[in-house]
Regions:
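Transmembrane alpha-helices and adjacent helix-loop boundaries
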Residues: 1-203
Length: 203
């Protein structure tokens, strides 16, 4: 849970920026943002974990710098970068769902592009983004099981360690699956309540 929450908070900020950059009128900015999204979404998450945990220290070692990433930090970096790409797509779609006429009306009132995005477009788009953002968080929560491959002691890894001690694989992995199911159901309910609250408040 710690890994998922830290990653989703950082990826919300990064994904919002990349999503806005992917709609930029400046071509190099738009191309870079979309290239980042394509790379992150087009490569396996497991490969990205190995790139960060094993590849990044090796790369810097070639440059003469020696350091090691701890497992939690490697997981946070990987999941944040990966989730940022998916959230960027959600943000981009949310912004594009707002009628173009609203931006034109804002400009006629003297608002610049930044003010229009901050005060008019993004608040409206945010409400439409809540369901897909919730789905992304749930996917991220389940994907954290992958960091077991680098030995990080999250839920799935702890299940593996217990199985290694008592060899009751079916019961242990079934219990792990039920815990993941409970976590995702709780998250789904929380997201649903947030969506209803935003509608009630007229956000």
């Amino acid at each position: 849970l710690q890994l998922a929450f830290i990653s989703v908070i950082s990826s919300l900020a990064g994904g919002s920026l990349i999503g806005i950059f992917s709609l930029s009128a400046i071509k190099p900015v738009r191309w870079l943002a979309r290239a980042y999204v394509d790379f992150s979404r087009g490569t396996p998450l497991l490969v990205q974990i190995f790139m960060i945990y094993f590849g990044l220290p090796a790369f810097f070692q070639e440059l003469g710098f020696s350091f090691l990433l701890n497992r939690l930090l490697a997981g946070v970096i990987t999941f944040s970068l990966n989730s940022t790409a998916y959230i960027a797509g959600i943000v981009r779609a949310g912004i594009q769902s707002i009628e173009v006429g609203q931006s034109e009306a804002a400009r006629s009132l003297g608002l610049n592009s930044l003010q229009t995005m901050r005060h008019l477009i993004f608040p409206q788009a945010l409400r439409r983004m809540i369901p897909p953002l919730g789905n992304e968080f749930i996917s991220l929560l389940k994907d954290t099981s992958l960091v077991a491959v680098i030995g990080f002691a999250e839920l799935f890894r702890k299940g593996q360690l217990i199985v290694a001690e008592n060899y009751r694989a079916f019961e242990i992995y079934a219990a792990v699956a039920v815990i993941y199911l409970c976590l995702t159901l709780v998250c789904s309910q929380a997201i649903s309540r947030l969506e209803k609250w935003m509608k009630w408040r007229g956000v």
